[in-house]
């Protein structure tokens, strides 16, 4: 798949999923307060990883991912309609550990050292 086309599909997937969650089109109660960070489509265009985070506990994280994965058909149908795709990538939702690590690193770097003297 053309890299430019791939980036366009990935960007539209992020927009579509975020918009559908925010607008309340996803009725699953497990899916709320979710941030969609990025998407990565496979070379053949058949699979897509969508990376998300939410403010929740580890137990709740599993429920959020389960809710998103159960609603993946709705997201795929909407994305296919928007982009007119012949092959709609199968969406797999994953927790974005890389984003969380970068936030932790940023917080660590911005903290002011405390003087105990």
Curated annotation (Swiss-Prot):
For this UniProt record, the keywords arranged alphabetically read as follows:
Cytoplasm, Ribosome biogenesis
Q: Name one Pfam family in it.
A: RBFA
Q: Indicate where this protein resides in the cell.
A: Cytoplasm
Give the record's GO CC terms: cytosol
The intrachain disulfides are none
Q: Name one GO molecular function term.
A: ribosomal small subunit binding
Superkingdom per UniProt: Bacteria
Biological processes per GO annotation: maturation of SSU-rRNA; ribosome biogenesis
Report the main location listed first in the record: cytoplasm
Q: Which HAMAP family match?
A: RbfA
Q: What does this protein do?
A: One of several proteins that assist in the late maturation steps of the functional core of the 30S ribosomal subunit. Associates with free 30S ribosomal subunits (but not with 30S subunits that are part of 70S ribosomes or polysomes). Required for efficient processing of 16S rRNA. May interact with the 5'-terminal helix region of 16S rRNA.
Under the heading NCBIfam families, the entry gives: rbfA
Q: How the protein assembles, per its UniProt entry?
A: Monomer. Binds 30S ribosomal subunits, but not 50S ribosomal subunits or 70S ribosomes.
Q: Which family does it belong to?
A: Belongs to the RbfA family.
User: What is this protein's name?
Assistant: Ribosome-binding factor A
Q: Which organism is it from?
A: Leptospira interrogans serogroup Icterohaemorrhagiae serovar Lai (strain 56601)
């Amino acid at each position: 798949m053309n890299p430019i086309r791939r980036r366009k599909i990935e960007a539209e997937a992020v927009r579509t999923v975020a918009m559908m969650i925010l607008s309340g089109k996803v009725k699953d109660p497990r899916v709320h307060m979710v941030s969609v960070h990025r998407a990565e489509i496979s070379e053949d265009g058949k699979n897509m990883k969508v990376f998300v985070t939410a403010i929740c506990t580890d137990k709740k994280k599993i429920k959020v991912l389960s809710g998103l994965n159960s609603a993946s058909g709705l997201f795929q149908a909407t994305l296919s309609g928007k982009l007119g795709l012949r092959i709609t990538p199968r969406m797999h939702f994953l927790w974005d550990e890389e984003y969380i690590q970068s936030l932790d690193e940023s917080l660590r770097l911005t903290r002011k050292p405390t003087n105990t003297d």
